[in-house]
UniProtKB/Swiss-Prot annotation:
CDD domains: RRM_SF. Residues 16-30, 161-170 have a biased composition (Low complexity). The keyword Ribosomal protein does not apply. SMART domains: RRM. Residues 77-154, 179-256, 310-387 form the RRM domain. Keywords: Cytoplasm, Nucleus, Repeat, RNA-binding. Its main location: cytoplasm. It comes from Schizosaccharomyces pombe (strain 972 / ATCC 24843) (Fission yeast). This is Serine/arginine (SR)-type shuttling mRNA binding protein. Gene3D superfamilies: 3.30.70.330. Transmembrane segments: none annotated. The gene is hrb1. PROSITE patterns: RRM. Residues 1-74, 158-179 are annotated as: Disordered. It is found in: Cytoplasm; Nucleus.
Length: 464
């Protein structure tokens, strides 16, 4: 097996402008696929079922092998790539898959809410390159995950361009999400003008914003939109991990830029989750997602605005947010123990969740950085979690000490209806008297008299 290759970064040369393929109409395929069916779209007046799954980045390249009369790509030149990182971009994946051949199309499959499914379809220029990719790149480490690659099983698949944004197709410019950068660890006194001047070193800046809290103070994070994707990549390489006014900057692509334009709608009084949104989770992440009954109290008994702790309450979440989405959102902030979304008995999200960190510092940092952050078009409401009753503590076991069962003493008081005999009373009472020990020079103990008020019977108890 080839030596595993670790891919975490990409070349800035991938920022070149790409051609956009033309729209192609066809009937739907009934072949079995490992990904969900796409929604229906109206194309040229006909209601045909098209692949509504689109590029993460809303770009597609024209296949030079496709003539005007050929609507579908060739199956033997396509491969399916699974177990991808949810943060991977199409140009990063193309760079990785391009090691073994010329990549014509690279499509990351997304959910209706814009989140990645963790899988993609790649098309090479020849069938031999596709077979080489399966043999060479499968089980290789890419962005921290072992990807698996196999042949694409859909015969009449094609890379439609219906999902290409108008801005990308009409004027040839890169879509804004591919040009939007997240800037972290900014000094709190930095203004948006300072941020814009800083990024002008890498290219033309369209917009620069500093995110503020409810009191109007900087959160230490900002958003910068460059004029092109190439300049955005150049800004990352130039400014990431550099010192700016005494602080080391974090500069990366804004992974939630695509989510902000995705609407979350409800129908009637509840939200209906489509089948595509039932995301499966590997057992590796189950402990972090809190998939056990012991953490139910962590979520369903939580309220906002609690005292400082390692648990935070995340409110105003989009209805489609899953446990996995919540975990991915806070993983970069600190060490997450578990992240859970609260659900109604009907399966509908309650719109809030709880995230537990390893320490209070990570919880405080997450509130400072993400409170008010627009996620899925909604400003998040973060605060420490509050519990009406304390969470049950983890039981501790003292090693080396035997367990002793203690039974509290119970004395029966006689009544006139059920008199207690002197002998039975004596036996019951003496069972709880300490055993007398011989002590030198100890005076004799006088007899003990016990008076019963109801029948005035005295019982003399002689110590043993």
């Amino acid at each position: 097996m080839p030596k595993p290759i670790e891919w975490n970064e990409f070349d800035s040369g991938m920022g070149s402008k790409l051609d956009v393929s033309s729209s192609l109409n066809s009937s739907s395929s009934n072949m079995d696929r490992d990904r969900s069916e796409s929604p229906k779209r109206h194309v040229n007046g006909s209601n045909s079922l098209k692949r509504g799954l689109h590029f993460d980045g809303e770009h597609t390249e024209r296949d030079p092998h496709l003539g005007n009369g050929q609507k579908y790509t060739q199956q033997e030149r396509r491969v399916y790539v699974g177990n991808l990182s949810y943060q991977v971009r199409w140009f990063e994946l193309k760079e990785f898959m391009g090691q073994v051949g010329n990549v014509l199309n690279c499509e990351i499959l997304n959910l209706p809410n814009g989140l990645s499914k963790g899988c993609a379809i790649i098309e090479y220029s020849t069938a031999e390159e596709a077979r080489t990719a399966i043999k060479t790149l499968s089980n290789q480490k890419f962005m921290g995950r072992l990807v698996y690659i196999r042949e694409d099983r859909e015969q009449n698949a094609r890379f439609g361009s219906s999902s290409v944004s108008p801005s990308a197709s009409s004027n040839g410019k890169d879509s804004e999400p591919d040009r939007q950068l997240f800037v972290g660890n900014l000094p709190y006194n930095v203004r948006w003008q300072d941020l814009k001047d800083l990024f002008r070193q890498a290219g033309s800046v369209i917009r620069a914003d500093i995110q503020m809290n409810q009191e109007g103070r900087s959160r230490g994070i900002g958003i910068v939109v460059m004029s092109s994707m190439k300049e955005a990549m150049h800004a990352i390489q130039m400014l990431h991990n550099t010192d700016f006014m005494g602080r080391t900057l974090e500069v990366r692509l804004d992974r939630f830029a695509h989510h902000k334009s995705k609407p979350y709608s409800t129908h009637g009084n509840g939200y209906t989750f489509p089948a595509e949104m039932q995301m499966t989770t590997s057992s590796t992440y189950l402990p972090m997602l809190g998939a056990n009954t012991q953490v139910e109290d962590l979520v369903y008994h939580a309220y906002p605005h609690g005292p400082c702790s390692d648990c935070i309450y995340v409110g105003n979440l989009p209805w489609a947010t899953s446990d996995r989405n919540l975990l991915d959102l806070f993983t970069d902030i600190g060490s997450v123990i578990r992240a859970r979304i609260a659900y109604e008995p009907t399966g509908r999200s309650k719109g809030f969740g709880v995230v537990q960190f390893e320490n209070e510092n990570d919880a405080a940092s997450s509130i400072e950085k993400l409170n008010g952050y627009r996620y899925g078009g909604r400003p998040l409401q973060l605060s420490y979690a509050h519990y009406a009753t304390p969470l049950p503590a983890v039981p501790t076991v003292l090693s080396g000490l035997p367990s002793v069962a203690y039974t509290p003493p119970v004395m029966h008081i006689p009544t006139t209806n059920s008199p207690l005999t002197p002998q039975s009373f004596t036996n019951s009472f003496l069972g709880y008297l300490p055993i007398s020990m011989p002590v030198a020079n100890m005076p004799a103990i006088a007899p003990i008299s016990v008076a019963l008020p109801e029948n005035n019977i005295e019982h003399s108890l002689e110590p043993s």
